[in-house]
């Protein structure tokens, strides 16, 4: 996204900064800098902005013919559903956010331009959402599959996309199959998009009713702001993932061979099968605190002013590069029976490992546990692929 609330003034601020840094679209040495901009849902799908026609015409970027007029005024170029630009001999293709009424014809466009794009030399495709079924996709996607189908014919295609805010500590951020797909991370905050489905401890949901069900406060995703620095070669990419909050690498560089192929180093299924889960040290201890009132610093709305059991989980060690702890699977056992299971993100999951040595938390309401209190907690540390170490 360029804007946050879909307002023209937000794009104006962005354009002013661009002009300040690159006056006349040129670097300090006079070299031309190309604008490789694509819009996201916060630019073109800002349905939360309400008002009459006069107000929306003045304020909202997506209203009627505003995209074309505003884009031309701010960036001195046409607002095209799909554009193609050349930078130092490499082709870049960008596609705008689909609105449902004027969607970019991605599949048709790639069929028409197939001959000029085919080959071993990489070209780059930019859109807001991850292509369906690729990097950071998890069990949800905001792409309907059209970009995946369009790019599948090009082993030299490299898609760079976002929308998910997925942290770049996630080792599945690079996906290779019929093409290459890369999670761009998020400048504002690296989080975990899958958290909406399986975690209590990440993003606060925008749904006020669902927010009341959160047992734990969200982990600070602003601390996880990140970006990529990519060195481009004809047969490979060197990808550096960078923490903006700490101004240091988020992990080891990724060296990606091109063209893509199934079964390569970034085949996510093979990465998972060969990865090793993190391990607790032999001296690690789980601290269990019985609270008459849930701790305010940790508890979410569902446990405010209620009794709970607070688990304080020590950080496990990384056994193999690329397999740092990402989350914890906690089971409540009574005798040999599992009563319930919860998954929480590791505190520090989205920051450089050098500053991630932190205690993680998990809360259970007392009403979730046996009345006698006779139960056992089993904690398994997992990496970003869901591979667990020993309990």
What role is predicted for each listed range?
Residues 117-136:
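Short acidic, glycine-rich surface-loop motifs adjacent to enzyme active sites
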